[in-house]
Amino acid sequence: MSQMHGTATHEAGLHSGPPPRPGQGREALPLTPARRVALLIGVPTCLALTGFIGFDLVAMVGQGHFHFSHTFAATTRQLNVNAGGGNVVVKVGSGPARLSGEATYSLVRPTITERATADSATLAYPCGFPVGNCGLNATVSVPAGTAVAISSGGGDLTASGLTGHVSLSADGGDLTATGITGDISLQTGGGDLSATLLAGDVTLGTSGGDITATQIDSPRVTVDSGGGDVAIVFTRVPQDVQVSADGGDVTIVVPAGPTTYDVTASADGGNLSDSVPQAATSAHKITASSGGGDVTIEQST
């Protein structure tokens, strides 16, 4: 009995004192310079990301829309429209210039503003928040010969029948232009650009989409593609063609015939084919280059 008692007393001695707290006895990780940097970067980033997601959800819940219609002065000969992020259709119509459609917004309803002079008007739809949907889904109707500068920050832009000075820009969507005559500038930020039946001096550009232009009756054409393919088909002998593509293929098709061209072409990462009649003294010049694709210059069949 005395041995059992002694053993019990010895075990009690081993467990004497207050019970250990969870985690007691573990050493804290040292706060090294690398861990300080990770905390300084990671914590604000996580907080910012959480706040942005929450704000985006609030903006989605707080979305609204309203219909609008606006007629410009009959003397307007130059029309500038910044449609925010909506889809825009531009066409020729009778009567004074007119804009109508549906406006969307998040949280706070913006006001459509107009600044006008004797012969020009500038209309803008300033979106107050960088999240959610905000823009004008609009149709713009202008008299023939009206100079236009139309831009959309995120939607598609479609134009037809315009004449005069025409500048169209779709920062995030596709751009489609048909039957336009004059001094023409068509630009996209990342979408595809499709044009047909253009006449006059033409400038085409995109940061990342493809450019396709057919039935082009233009003496001077300048094209700059940031990453997509370029294809241009002429219905008349061009005077000066300049095409540059950072990474896509380039195809230029000119009318069949005896006309010679002064050609300067390069394909840094692809194949080069230039089968058109050539003469260094020709007044018809073609300059084409691609940073990563093929370059083809040929006559129509």
Set out the residue ranges of the language-model regions.
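A cross-taxa feature marking solvent-exposed loop/turn segments within ectodomains of secreted
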Residues: 107-109, 133, 258, 281
